[in-house]
């Protein structure tokens, strides 16, 4: 019995969402990795469709982490600021290339007094979203420390990084241009994909989370295909080894029976 709710029509991804800036992207391919497309077409995605991928959202107090999540998950924007106490999370279900895929978006507190509590929930993340305020240089400078703290609980080689500038609607074109240069530099240094969004207007929010879902899905399928291939090779080696042992055993038996 399927206990999961059906995937919403606006959460179906048949193509790879593109990056915002090619100079600060995790990759610039126009399509999903060929091995991922092939695995989906041949229904060889293993347990990917049954897994829940964890995404943590970190950043300074009041940079707009909760508003970002709420705009995507609930299509709402609350002008009355309420600080997140500890952690909270939302579950979002997608269908990517015909395969069900779930993201668990963890909204963590930016307040120093809740940092220890929030950090206990960092472990096991497959993607880390570091949010800063496009109108606050200090919040951008603090992103590296947020990343350092998050990576203490995760393997840097197995996690996707996204650097997201929020409150774009409050920036003038000139202000945004200056901040974007600095943000792109930081994104390149930490090997993160850069995005600029507005939770108030919704600008780039949907596109951003679709990109997160697609790249996380792609990474999961590639990892599963790789594991399946490794298991297959191990089985072949084991079978060949067993065959060889059987041959040697038979030869020994034959030798002992000969005069």
UniProtKB/Swiss-Prot annotation:
Residues binding GTP: 62-66, 78, 81, 84, 110, 167, 169, 198
PROSITE patterns: RAB (PS51419)
Cofactor: Mg(2+)
Description of activity control: Regulated by guanine nucleotide exchange factors (GEFs) which promote the exchange of bound GDP for free GTP. Regulated by GTPase activating proteins (GAPs) which increase the GTP hydrolysis activity. Inhibited by GDP dissociation inhibitors (GDIs).
Residues recorded as bearing Phosphoserine in the entry: 241
Record Gene3D superfamilies: P-loop containing nucleotide triphosphate hydrolases
GO MF entry, a single one: guanyl nucleotide binding
Entry membrane topology: Lipid-anchor
Keywords attached to this entry: Acetylation, Cell projection, Cilium biogenesis/degradation, Cytoplasm, Cytoplasmic vesicle, Cytoskeleton, Golgi apparatus, GTP-binding, Hydrolase, Lipoprotein, Magnesium, Membrane, Metal-binding, Nucleotide-binding, Phosphoprotein, Prenylation, Protein transport, Transport
CDD domains: Rab36_Rab34
EC number(s) recorded for this UniProt protein: 3.6.5.2
Reactions this protein catalyses: GTP + H2O = GDP + phosphate + H(+)
Function: The small GTPases Rab are key regulators of intracellular membrane trafficking, from the formation of transport vesicles to their fusion with membranes. Rabs cycle between an inactive GDP-bound form and an active GTP-bound form that is able to recruit to membranes different sets of downstream effectors directly responsible for vesicle formation, movement, tethering and fusion. RAB34 transports protein involved in the redistribution of lysosomes to the peri-Golgi region. Plays a role in the maturation of phagosomes that engulf pathogens, such as S.aureus and M.tuberculosis.
Protein name: Ras-related protein Rab-34
Species this protein is from: Mus musculus
Gene it is expressed from: Rab34
């Amino acid at each position: 019995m399927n206990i999961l709710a059906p995937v919403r029509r606006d959460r179906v991804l048949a193509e790879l969402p593109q990056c915002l800036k090619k100079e600060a992207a995790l990759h610039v391919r126009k399509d999903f990795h060929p091995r991922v497309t092939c695995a989906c077409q041949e229904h060889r995605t293993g347990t990917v469709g049954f897994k829940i991928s964890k995404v943590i959202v970190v950043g300074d107090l009041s940079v707009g982490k909760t508003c970002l999540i709420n705009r995507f998950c609930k299509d709402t924007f609350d002008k009355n600021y309420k600080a997140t106490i500890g952690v909270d999370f939302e579950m979002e279900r997608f269908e990517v290339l015909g395969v069900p895929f779930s993201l668990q978006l963890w909204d963590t507190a930016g307040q120093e007094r809740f940092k220890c509590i929030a950090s206990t929930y960092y472990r096991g993340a497959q993607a880390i979203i570091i949010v800063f305020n496009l109108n606050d240089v200090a919040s951008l400078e603090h992103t590296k420390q947020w990343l350092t703290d998050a990576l203490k609980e995760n393997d840097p080689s197995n996690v996707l990084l996204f650097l997201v500038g929020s409150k774009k609607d409050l920036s003038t074109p000139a202000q945004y241009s200056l901040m974007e240069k600095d943000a792109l530099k930081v994104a390149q240094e930490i090997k993160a994909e850069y995005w600029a969004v507005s939770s108030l207007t919704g600008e780039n929010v949907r596109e951003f989370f679709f990109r997160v879902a697609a790249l996380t899905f792609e990474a999961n399928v590639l990892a599963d295909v790789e594991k399946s291939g490794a298991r297959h090779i191990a089985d072949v080696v084991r079978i060949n080894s067993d065959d060889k042992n059987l041959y040697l055993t038979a030869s020994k038996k034959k030798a002992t029976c000969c005069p």
